[in-house]
Structure formats: structure tokens, C-alpha cells
Swiss-Prot record:
Gene3D superfamilies xrefs: Mur ligase, C-terminal domain, Mur-like, catalytic domain, NAD(P)-binding Rossmann-like Domain
Organism phylogeny: Bacteria, Pseudomonadati, Pseudomonadota, Gammaproteobacteria, Pasteurellales
Organism: Haemophilus influenzae (strain ATCC 51907 / DSM 11121 / KW20 / Rd)
EC number, UniProt record: 6.3.2.8
Record function comment: Cell wall formation.
Catalytic activity: UDP-N-acetyl-alpha-D-muramate + L-alanine + ATP = UDP-N-acetyl-alpha-D-muramoyl-L-alanine + ADP + phosphate + H(+)
Pathway: Cell wall biogenesis; peptidoglycan biosynthesis
Cellular component terms (Gene Ontology): cytoplasm
Name of this chain's protein: UDP-N-acetylmuramate--L-alanine ligase
Gene Ontology biological process terms from the UniProt entry: cell division; cell wall organization; peptidoglycan biosynthetic process; regulation of cell shape
Binding site for ATP: 125-131
Cellular compartment(s): Cytoplasm
Enzyme class: ligase
Length: 475
């Protein structure tokens, strides 16, 4: 569904002078979703990225002008430039935009404009926000409310990470990594949990991070709703400071929407939610782990508070196939030593890695877990080094790839070799460092056994590597 420029004036009247919007770093998950929404609203979209891929190709097919690589001439004709937080200050397109006095804004500022004239539901938190955003989006879709959604990962049921709906509802993932979620002014805000991460943004001060989240929740109008996880002690510490209505969810006895009797059979979860009015709702999930039960209950709480019928909620949750790269099963493969299953997962923080391992253990019984782990950013590896050592020691076999730098300079003692050394010293697993990923398949064939679950874990290029491995194993 595309709109004419006359129709755009009715959708976002204040943006009527904007004709062309240029995205620097358009291939990123958050950037591409916003670009797709604006493209479907009828704006001319251009964008650049350092590499071509599925996302940039899809945008090009939809009508966006895509450039591979960055050059000053790419911003020609742009009314406004949207910049990813990954873009450096010396980027030629960014430099030229400022010289030409073209407005340059963060992606969250553009998302805020899209949200301004809609009923916004924003999902924040250190872990689980992509999955929770996807679940809420699918519930509203199942309820025939045709929401607009912008997610940080693929919504598998929809086959994309963004959709322009016809209704007033907008469901969006809120990014705390650069504190840009403070631009958003939603009607409902979900916070899944809070742990120290992206601490460079918060000057290494967790108290500053907490205060920023409270400020985010105070962007709600006085009649808005905050939905917070009762199992997270940091969030419960913040509740008295939130001057808005707060609804909680979780396994905790104090939760307004309380999870009881959780059981996992294979990779399927089922449990009961006790609602504030003591209504009991039986939930079936086809994604594993208690962390996904929490994500689903956050989505259920939002939907119930906004008056959506149980039938739509339960059907959407039962049909939910997961978000892209969240326990993404790539298939079963016959290898020289037997049959193995390969799973790709985005988790790159020790807590995320831990819950993925736990869900795999519960679903995979007494089978071995072989992990291919790619640390993401030197700064995160440094800040959470001891936590990584502990959690990565929980698997049966560990292959370590080099750190995915994400533009950072190396930090002494925060590389994969150092991580391997400390894990080996702990004595629970003997990691294998594989710097040349072309050797990964051969290394795996030497260590895997019949029935193994192979977890490819991390936020960098490990997904592409694991999918390449799956393709080669099919042949």
C-alpha cells in the first residue's frame, strides 16, 4: 500500500515539505524497518550501506534507491538524512549533509515522527524486546487491527521486520543502546528487564542508565501505561519512581499477570497466566524457554489492558514462529559422525546466552550442546568478561570465533584468545579458537557426535557463517 504525496500530508502533515529521505546505514535492522514504512507512505527513499544483502535488495525491489558504499554524491536531493548510531562522524555523506545544512536526525527521531500521530506501543529492555515487539505485533494483527510495526528483527510470521498498517496502532522496538528511545512518546511502554549493557552511552554509570529508563517511562502521558517485569529486581526498584500507571508481569507472586505451572515439552512451552481479576488463561507457545514465556506474558498483558479478546491473543501466541535469529532452527543434517541439529541465535550478552543454553537443555534432554560463539564488540567482552567465562563454560563443547568488532578498535585482554584462556583455566570445557572461518566445518566434523545440538551464537557475522554452513551441509 503506497500513498500519494497529497495523502502523506494527511498522515504526517508537519512533514509535508519532505520529499526525499536518505538513510546512512540503511541495511541495519532498525533503519531498514523505518525506511520501509516511509517508502510505503509514499516518500522517496534513498540509502547507503557498506555491503549488499537481503534487506537492501528487498528495499531496492520496493523502490528505494540503494547505494553500496558511502560517497557524498549519494545525498543528492535529500530533504533530510537519517543516520544509524553505527555511523562515524567522518562518514562522507554525514559530513556533506552538515555542510549543506540538510537536517540530520537519529533513526529514533524519525520513528518518533511516525509515532506522533498514532497510538504508540514501545518495547524497551536489555533482553527480549525484539521477540516481545514481534509477539505484540502478531496479536494485534490476529485481532484484525492491522497495526504498523517496526521491529529490530524479522517477524517470521510476516516475513519482514516492518509493516505499514491502516490502523492508528504502531508497535515499535525502542533502542536504549544510544538512549535515543527518549525521543519516543508512546501511549504504552513495555520494559522487559534491565542490566548493564552499552555502558559507554551511560558513561559507565548504571544509576544513570536507570534514570534514563525512568525518563523514558515519563514520556508516557499521564493516562499512559507502563508494563514492567516483576521478576527483574532493578525494574521493581524503579517502580516507585515511575509516576504513571504500572502493570507488572512475571513468575513473581507480586506480578499483576502471574505465570504459573510452566512446563516445556521439547521446544514447546505451556503455562497458565493469572490475570489481575483472577481470570486464568492457559497459554501454548511453540518457542522454548521461560524467557519466552515472559516475553509472551508481556505481550498478553498489553493486549488484555487494551481490550483485545483472549481468542486473538492465544491464537497469535500459539502460531508465533519466533523472531529472526532467535533460536532459529536451520535444520537437521547428517554428518560423518551422525545426525546433528543446527540453531542460530542472536543472543550476545551473557544473560541471553545463558537462557538460550537453558532452553536448549530443557528441550534437548541429555544431548550434548556444541556452541559456536562469536563475541560482539571488544568493549562488551571487556565489561562482561567474567560473566562470559562462566556462561560459556556451561556447554559441552565450545568453538570460539574472533571478536566481531562492530567498528571498535581492539582492547588488550578482551579478545577471543584471552576469553579462551580464562574458560580453559576454569576447567569445565576446553574451547577451540577458530580464526579462519573457512575451517569451521572441518573443525566441527572432528568434534560433533550423533544427536548434538549445535548453537551458533552472537550478533555479528556468525549468523551468515552458520547459514553458509547449513547450505554446504545440504549438498
Amino acid at each position: 500500500m503506497k500513498h500519494s504525496h497529497e495523502e502523506i500530508r494527511k498522515i504526517i502533515p508537519e512533514m509535508r515539505r519532505v520529499q526525499q529521505i536518505h538513510f546512512i546505514g540503511i541495511g541495519g535492522a532498525g533503519m531498514s524497518g523505518i525506511a520501509e514504512i516511509l517508502l510505503n507512505e509514499g516518500y522517496q527513499i534513498s540509502g547507503s550501506d557498506i555491503a549488499d544483502g537481503v534487506v537492501t535488495q528487498r528495499l531496492a525491489q520496493a523502490g528505494a534507491k540503494i547505494y553500496i558504499g558511502h560517497a557524498e554524491e549519494h545525498i543528492e536531493g535529500a530533504s533530510v538524512v537519517v543516520v544509524s548510531s553505527a555511523i562515524k562522524d567522518d562518514n562522507p555523506e554525514l559530513v556533506t549533509s552538515k555542510q549543506k545544512r540538510i537536517p540530520v536526525i537519529q533513526r529514533a527521531q524519525m520513528l518518533a515522527e511516525i509515532m506522533r500521530f498514532r497510538h504508540g506501543i514501545a518495547v524497551a529492555g536489555t533482553h527480549g524486546k525484539t521477540t516481545t515487539t514481534a509477539m505484540i505485533s502478531m496479536i494485534y494483527t490476529q485481532a484484525k487491527l492491522d497495526p504498523t510495526f517496526v521491529n529490530g528483527g524479522l517477524v517470521k510470521s510476516a516475513g519482514k521486520n516492518a509493516h505499514l498498517g491502516a490502523s492508528r496502532y504502531l508497535i515499535a522496538e525502542a533502542d536504549e543502546s544510544d538512549a535515543s528511545f527518549l525521543h519516543l512518546q508512546p501511549m504504552v511502554s513495555v520494559v522487559t528487564n534491565m542490566e548493564p549493557d552499552h555502558m559507554d552511552t551511560y558513561e559507565g554509570d548504571f544509576e544513570k542508565m536507570k534514570a534514563t529508563y525512568v525518563k523514558f517511562l515519563h514520556n508516557l502521558p499521564f493516562y499512559g501505561l507502563a508494563v514492567m517485569c516483576a521478576d527483574d529486581p532493578v525494574l521493581m526498584e524503579l517502580v516507585p519512581k515511575v509516576g504513571r500507571q504500572v502493570i507488572t508481569y512475571g513468575f513473581s507472586e507480586q506480578a499483576d499477570y502471574r505465570i504459573e505451572d510452566y512446563e516445556q515439552t521439547g521446544f514447546q512451552g505451556h503455562y497458565t497466566v493469572i490475570c489481575p481479576n483472577n481470570e486464568r488463561i492457559n497459554v501454548l507457545l511453540n518457542v522454548p524457554g521461560k524467557h519466552n514465556a515472559l516475553n509472551a506474558t508481556a505481550a498478553l498483558a498489553v493486549a488484555k489492558e487494551e481490550g483485545i479478546a483472549n481468542e486473538a491473543i492465544l491464537e497469535a501466541l500459539a502460531d508465533f514462529q519466533g523472531a529472526g535469529r532467535r533460536f532459529d532452527q536451520l535444520g537437521e543434517f547428517i554428518r560423518p559422525n551422525g545426525k546433528v541439529r543446527l540453531v542460530d541465535d542472536y543472543g550476545h550478552h551473557p544473560t541471553e546466552v545463558g537462557v538460550t543454553i537453558k532452553a536448549a537443555r530443557e528441550g534437548w534432554g541429555d544431548k550434548r550442546i556444541v556452541m559456536i560463539f562469536q563475541p560482539h564488540r571488544y568493549s562488551r567482552t571487556r565489561d562482561l568478561f567474567d560473566d562470559f567465562v562462566q556462561v560459556l563454560s556451561q556447554v559441552d563443547a565450545l568453538i570460539m570465533l574472533d571478536v566481531y568488532a562492530a567498528g571498535e578498535a581492539p582492547i588488550v585482554g578482551a579478545d577471543s584468545k584471552s576469553l579462551c584462556r580464562s574458560i580453559r583455566n576454569l576447567g569445565k570445557v576446553d574451547p577451540i579458537l577458530v580464526s579462519d572461518t573457512s575451517q569451521l566445518g572441518d573443525v566441527l566434523d572432528q568434534i560433533i557426535q550423533d544427536g548434538d545440538l549445535i548453537l551458533a551464537q552472537g550478533a555479528g557475522s556468525v549468523s551468515k557463517i552458520s547459514r553458509g554452513l547449513a547450505e554446504s551441509w545440504k549438498n
